[in-house]
Amino acid sequence: MKTFPRLPDRGDFAFQMLVAPYRTSGAALHDLRGFYGPHLSKTMPFGTVRDAEGHMYTMVRSVNSPTGTPNQTRFIYQSTRVDGQTLRMDKPRMAATAQTLMPTRALEADTARWTSLDGEPGTPWRLDASGEHMRWVEEGLMDLQGRNIGPGMQWLLPGVDWGTFYLSQLYDVAGTCEGRPVKGIVAVEQSYMAEGGQVHAKKCLIVNNKKHVIWCAFATVYTDGSIDAGTFLVGHENLGFAFLVNEKGEVRTTTDVEALVSRDDGDPFIKHVKLTVEGGEEWEFLPDPKGRMVDFLGGHVPTAQQEGRWQRVGETRTPDHWFAWGEGDRRNGTARNVLGTEA
């Protein structure tokens, strides 16, 4: 049962959340209508793929909405091939792509499409997404496509002056990066914010209030064809949920979730996470030794981003391909209502 050590004001629900699956469609992804007050801010494709040598490639594009506030950074591309040590931004390749402020938008059959503008500087890009498939092309750099993993996820976090409505759809993808065959996972997410809001930056209830301890979208495809996928979010007061989906498309959700985050002294990156769902089901986050996204530190996104893998404690299945793009902030602490430091 939830408790309220801090008595909230009217309209303040002490960071309680609603979470559920939803039926993803191209029409829904294309729609510009708002929900519960917030407006569509942007669409965010992002993911991690690996090649046969084990090198990682991660990418994210800010696909701005006409009703949103544009990000300064439009496209980020990282790989472990830059320095061989960890994920680093490949700035020459990033700079070569079109830095589209406001993309073209179209709905073809039931596929939403966003593209760069004809004639703008940089190499063209295109994103297609629906409830069944996606394809993401950054011309001359990468071409990824694949099928959906289960239904989409939606969560709502209300606030007194502004809240957040957030959606995510995961896809099992394969293709090429830098001409090399790769496979992995891509998420296509959409954030709905108050006017002028940006997730992670402005009018963001979670980040601006330093509330989250761990936030991570993930998926693991095992060699036997089974899948574990979803999102974990745990923070202070009543913030948090678990959304879990398997290869059959069966979904489980709960807001009864706790986490304990471990870090080495002075290290912004996570060493290990033990997460408990509804008091009994235990999961753990295993960071990739080369998964630290060091070039994010001090940038638009203030939290330490890293790649790894989630699994149930005691898991015996063999993973084939996976992603777990997670984030935490040592300033926010190590567990619910266990605060961190500003250092």
Ranges and model annotations:
Residues 1-343:
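Targeting-peptide/extracellular-domain and disordered-appendage signature
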